[in-house]
Design a protein with these regions (language model features):
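A generic structural micro-feature
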Residues: 9-13, 40-43, 91-96
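A residue-level structural signature of the nucleotidyltransferase/glycosyltransferase Rossmann-like core
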Residues: 11-12, 28, 43, 110, ...
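Acidic, metal-coordinating catalytic segment for phosphate/diphosphate chemistry
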Residues: 1-18
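Conserved Nudix-box catalytic region and its N-terminal flanking loop in Nudix hydrolases
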Residues: 27-68
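A short coil-to-beta-strand element that immediately follows conserved catalytic motifs
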Residues: 72-82
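Nudix hydrolase/Nudix homology domain
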Residues: 4, 37, 80-149
């Protein structure tokens, strides 16, 4: 489905998840969107995506992180942080986002990106994440910045 191809009614919402992965040294795993994406091409983000019917958000974020990065966070410290809501009546795309934060020790070689979705990745400092956000090329940062500490 292409972005902006939704047909939701004003009172309908879908659920998405985002997963912040932080190493004990304070660095974060961020991914770069494919350069051929219709929306946000080449921008930075954290792993995430839609929750499937019958799936709870924790299972969805574990699945999305594993699909996009190859990392299994099912036994990692951390978990649910908070949720936010977006209402976009013009786009007919209303959604809730559940934000998760996991603490896990991993190295570059542990990351196996999903080539259909992810252009690349970076083990970034908080300052690097904030710099991408200031440039306007880090998706959802303003809605989730409190989970980066």
């Amino acid at each position: 489905m292409k972005r902006n191809d939704w047909s939701m009614k004003p009172d309908e919402f879908h659920l998405t998840v985002l997963g912040v992965l932080k190493r004990p040294d304070g660095r974060y795993l961020i991914t770069q969107r494919k350069l051929d994406k219709e929306w946000g091409a080449g921008w930075w983000e954290v792993p995430g995506g839609g929750v499937n019917a019958g799936e709870d958000s924790r299972d969805a974020v574990i699945r999305e992180i594993r699909e996009e990065t190859g990392i299994d966070v099912s036994q990692a410290a951390g978990g649910y942080a908070f949720s936010y809501k977006r209402v976009n009546p013009e786009e007919k795309n209303n959604y809730f986002v559940d934000i998760y934060k996991f603490i896990l020790d991993f190295v570059d070689n542990d990351v196996k990106v999903q080539p259909e979705e992810v252009e690349g990745f970076k083990i970034a400092t908080l300052e690097e994440v904030q710099a991408f956000a200031k440039e306007g090329i880090f998706l959802h940062y303003d809605s989730m910045k409190e989970v980066f500490d």
